[in-house]
Amino acid sequence: MPDLSLERACGGRVAGVDEVGRGPLAGPVVAAAVVIDAGRADPALLARLDDSKKLSAALRQRLATALLADPGVEVGLGEASVAEIDRINILQATFLAMGRALAKLAPPVDLALVDGNRLPPLPCPGQAVVRGDGLSLSIAAASIVAKVHRDAAMATLAQALPGYGWERNAGYGTAEHLAALDRLGATPHHRASFAPVREALARSALPGHKCVTALTFS
């Protein structure tokens, strides 16, 4: 289970950073940066935190709500849009979202613990932590908040663009999503730089195929 050992060892004001949404075919990539003040945060809440992938959707939602309301927890959220993903690639867009999340924290942190094995350019010193969401409470908290935020955003998009199942698959390339992409065509919220979307766009240019890429959605 994650704890605050890494944060305490580093000293100072430390944020855990994690992202969600690198793999989906649609929607933004989202990052969260979280600072936990162990002296003020609810210990019962901290005891329930874990890697977001190990938690049910309902529990993630409850924990994210509690984290955002806890006076001992600070949260910064950052996104990179589909247009940015297609322009600079998903890795660089992920790094951009992480930097934006950290920039939301004030005052700035002394160190960022970033989940993964690569350290992006950041507005502060950083340390990459492999499987950090299972080691660091602040990274685990960031993974939960980022996941819940992005899932909610995709559910909202699903209301405007029904048929792709985004409220269930969050834009990932499930069988349902791929079938809808073939049947309905790509939308402005699809990542044109990803192969399945690129192939769908090529098919949509053929006579008799539907294309919705000319539509705009707010």
Swiss-Prot record:
Gene Ontology biological-process entries: DNA replication, removal of RNA primer; mismatch repair
Domain RNase H type-2: residue ranges: 12-206
Cofactor annotation remark: Manganese or magnesium. Binds 1 divalent metal ion per monomer in the absence of substrate. May bind a second metal ion after substrate binding.
Major localization class: cytoplasm
Annotated keywords: Cytoplasm, Endonuclease, Hydrolase, Manganese, Metal-binding, Nuclease
Subcellular location: Cytoplasm
Binding-site residues for a divalent metal cation, renumbered to this chain: 18-19, 115
NCBIfam families: PRK00015.1-3
Stated name of the protein: Ribonuclease HII
Organism of derivation: Rhodospirillum rubrum (strain ATCC 11170 / ATH 1.1.1 / DSM 467 / LMG 4362 / NCIMB 8255 / S1)
